[in-house]
A protein has these predicted regions:
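Class I S-adenosyl-L-methionine
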Residues: 6, 134-192
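Rossmann-like AdoMet
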Residues: 1-81, 85-139
């Protein structure tokens, strides 16, 4: 990451979860705060994922949703968690009929992503968090293809001495390294 030195002052240490949160979601410098298209897809740029690679993926999901609607006997609500700029939802909306999905909803933490969706998908209810969405009645499909790889997480390591957590620490010259130490919270040990 080009701006990694801003995240930690020399000698500062944070959990990997906190570092990941800052690197992805910092309002000015985080990965998801950058303007859309700043890193075009390809070897020198951003990665390509199934929802954005080809409209065929959305066509497949439209067929799945139509079958679910038929089976349930009522229109569905479709929620895309981590919707990005809405490319998948734009493709999906083009394949859906009005009888299949009653509501299209998107959760996206990036203001730039929500802005892009607001401009091109007026029929989609947008929110920065799941808690901001109004409740849905009837069957609901939660789609989270782009979400799980962007959830901050703790890095843990089992050693002969017990459970350790890996922290990100900045050296005096600003380079980052992983340092093992006691878990940041007892909840981590209790969970495992």
């Amino acid at each position: 990451m080009a701006n990694e030195r801003w995240i930690l002052a020399p000698g500062q240490r944070v959990t990997f979860a906190r570092f990941m949160e800052l690197a992805l979601y910092h309002p000015q410098l985080g990965y998801y705060a950058r303007p859309r298209g700043a890193y075009p897809a390809g070897p020198e740029g951003d990665f390509v994922t199934a929802p954005t690679a080809h409209p065929l993926f959305a066509a497949l999901w439209a067929e799945i949703l139509a079958a679910l609607r038929e089976r349930r006997g009522q229109p569905l609500t479709f929620v895309d968690l981590g919707a990005g700029d809405g490319r998948f939802l734009r493709n999906l909306a083009g394949f859906l009929d009005a009888q299949t999905v009653a509501r299209l909803m998107a959760v996206e933490v990036s203001p730039a992503g929500r802005e892009a969706m607001a401009a091109s998908l007026p029929q989609v209810e947008l929110a920065a968090s799941l808690a901001e969405l109004s409740p849905s009645e009837g069957p609901c499909v939660i789609f989270a293809s782009e979400l799980y790889d962007a959830l901050p997480c703790h890095l843990l390591e089992g050693t002969e001495g017990g459970l350790c957590e890996l922290y990100v620490e900045a050296s005096e010259d600003g380079t980052l390294r992983l340092v093992a130490d006691n878990p940041s919270t007892s909840e981590l040990s209790a969970y495992l």
